[in-house]
Amino acid sequence: MVIVGGGTAGWMTAAYLKTAFGDRLSITVVESSRIGTIGVGEATFSDIQHFFQFLNLREQDWMPACNATYKLGIRFENWRHVGHHFYQPFEQIRPVYGFPLTDWWLHDAPTDRFDTDCFVMPNLCEAGRSPRHLDGTLADEDFVEEGDELANRTMSEHQGKSQFPYAYHFEAALLAKFLTGYAVDRGVEHVVDDVLDVRLDQRGWIEHVVTAEHGEIHGDLFVDCTGFRGLLLNKALGVPFVSYQDTLPNDSAVALQVPLDMQRRGIVPNTTATAREAGWIWTIPLFGRVGTGYVYAKDYLSPEEAERTLREFVGPAAADVEANHIRMRIGRSQESWRNNCVAIGLSSGFVEPLESTGIFFIHHAIEQLVKHFPAADWNPKSRDMYNSAVAHVMDGIREFLVIHYRGAARADNQYWRDTKTRPLPDGLAERIECWQTQLPDTETIYPYYHGLPPYSYMCILMGGGAIRTPASAALALTDQGAAQKEFAAVRDRAAQLRDTLPSHYEYLARMRGLDV
């Protein structure tokens, strides 16, 4: 196997496949020293636990090396209106008499905050707490760390069985560097060189790549991790790109890496997505700095205006920080696997990082490649099933992102008004009609695996405020006592954890052996 391109996609692929197949599969990574990585995807899904468990990596092994922090969820600011915020946590919704607690909240809300009333994790985010006690035990006592269960299940197989209570933020470049060492130590060949050409055989399959200093590099299976260039899949093999721009117009970003004194400031355990005039700003807390960026649509805002807005948002700490302007290719390749070439990462597809899906797309693609790994006869059905799984995930995430905008009540300028009138992906209008009658469930969300459970949809709809759902009529005829006890249980558990958990900074500092 030849992986063209390093970065997070290339080295996650190399490390995972080497762990899966050992010496039975020869892996070469060809990586240019001149081409930088995009590095937008610094936040993750909680399902990333499967990746590290599969590689048998403990948090203390890799987190300090990658300036990693915990992520208990996403805080959305200004999506309903300026000054309003809500959380989308990693926490399964509690049921009462078969109805989600959010439904009971619609019937008789204890306060005006569905997130802190129905979930524990948003309370810990607002208190700046670690998800682990100082002895390493998880705050979520209902979750059993499953060890081999996580390592031996794919993300799609695990969904719905339990919810790991957090994900991570990390520096993508540092994770790639860490995984480079991990993979090379286990026998992956690392070739630092520029690929000058891709040569095809008479069938149109890739025969070899031509490099500047190492000549021809041959392989049976080629993995395209060349980013938005799509050097192998799109350029050499001519696979078309399917744009999502008709429904997701944000196509640009400007990013800053801002050094900060985290001991003084503290570290919030969540990603923040702050809605702005022509898009939104991400804030990702790392150990020692904050990654931040403005995702916007160039039809509404110039790069200069975007950078100025971002610097004003960050404040004086951004004064001497160099800005990185990124042109994003939003959509997916029509096929992510053609002939003997599989694209993973940005060359396969990308959407704006509103739900931290960049790393998730990579991880899912790797799992599916192992699941559908080609035999000697290159059965086309394996390829077709892989392409279907990857397309469903990306199309499902596309739909979920559209809901963020269609479901946000904010409409204070042309950009936000236009989010309510753009065309919807096929089937979404009917689903929205269902959600105006009842909250999303497994029967009414996007029907194929895409990494997101119904409670995530509930949070976006209830937080955004534009698509209103009434409480189920049955609740008026049902005893209210059990629901009130459940609200009290959430409140009590949140208070207990606020009082007993260390701060996020303290836990991470102690992991690094620092004095606090």
Swiss-Prot record:
<feature type="binding site">
    <location>
        <position position="357"/>
    </location>
    <ligand>
        <name>chloride</name>
    </ligand>
</feature>
<dbReference type="GO" id="GO:0000166">
    <property type="term" value="F:nucleotide binding"/>
</dbReference>
<feature type="active site">
    <location>
        <position position="71"/>
    </location>
</feature>
<keyword id="KW-0274">FAD</keyword>
<keyword id="KW-0285">Flavoprotein</keyword>
<feature type="binding site">
    <location>
        <position position="8"/>
    </location>
    <ligand>
        <name>FAD</name>
    </ligand>
</feature>
<dbReference type="InterPro" id="IPR036188">
    <property type="entry name" value="FAD/NAD-bd_sf"/>
</dbReference>
<comment type="function">
    <text>Involved in the biosynthesis of kutznerides, actinomycete-derived antifungal and antimicrobial cyclic hexadepsipeptides. Together with KtzQ, catalyzes the regiospecific dichlorination of L-tryptophan (L-Trp) to produce 6,7-dichloro-L-tryptophan. KtzR catalyzes the chlorination of 7-chloro-L-tryptophan at C6 position to yield 6,7-dichloro-L-tryptophan. Can also use L-Trp as substrate and form 6-chloro-L-tryptophan, but has a 120-fold preference for 7-chloro-L-tryptophan over L-Trp. Cannot use piperazic acid or gamma,delta-dehydropiperazic acid.</text>
</comment>
<dbReference type="InterPro" id="IPR006905">
    <property type="entry name" value="Flavin_halogenase"/>
</dbReference>
<feature type="binding site">
    <location>
        <position position="195"/>
    </location>
    <ligand>
        <name>FAD</name>
    </ligand>
</feature>
<feature type="binding site">
    <location>
        <position position="359"/>
    </location>
    <ligand>
        <name>FAD</name>
    </ligand>
</feature>
<dbReference type="GO" id="GO:0004497">
    <property type="term" value="F:monooxygenase activity"/>
</dbReference>
<keyword id="KW-0547">Nucleotide-binding</keyword>
<feature type="site" description="Important for activity">
    <location>
        <position position="355"/>
    </location>
</feature>
<dbReference type="InterPro" id="IPR033856">
    <property type="entry name" value="Trp_halogen"/>
</dbReference>
<comment type="similarity">
    <text>Belongs to the flavin-dependent halogenase family. Bacterial tryptophan halogenase subfamily.</text>
</comment>
<protein>
    <recommendedName>
        <fullName>7-chloro-L-tryptophan 6-halogenase KtzR</fullName>
        <ecNumber>1.14.19.60</ecNumber>
    </recommendedName>
</protein>
<feature type="binding site">
    <location>
        <position position="43"/>
    </location>
    <ligand>
        <name>FAD</name>
    </ligand>
</feature>
<feature type="binding site">
    <location>
        <position position="9"/>
    </location>
    <ligand>
        <name>FAD</name>
    </ligand>
</feature>
<dbReference type="Pfam" id="PF04820">
    <property type="entry name" value="Trp_halogenase"/>
</dbReference>
<feature type="binding site">
    <location>
        <position position="358"/>
    </location>
    <ligand>
        <name>chloride</name>
    </ligand>
</feature>
<keyword id="KW-0560">Oxidoreductase</keyword>
<feature type="binding site">
    <location>
        <position position="6"/>
    </location>
    <ligand>
        <name>FAD</name>
    </ligand>
</feature>
<feature type="binding site">
    <location>
        <position position="42"/>
    </location>
    <ligand>
        <name>FAD</name>
    </ligand>
</feature>
<dbReference type="InterPro" id="IPR050816">
    <property type="entry name" value="Flavin-dep_Halogenase_NPB"/>
</dbReference>
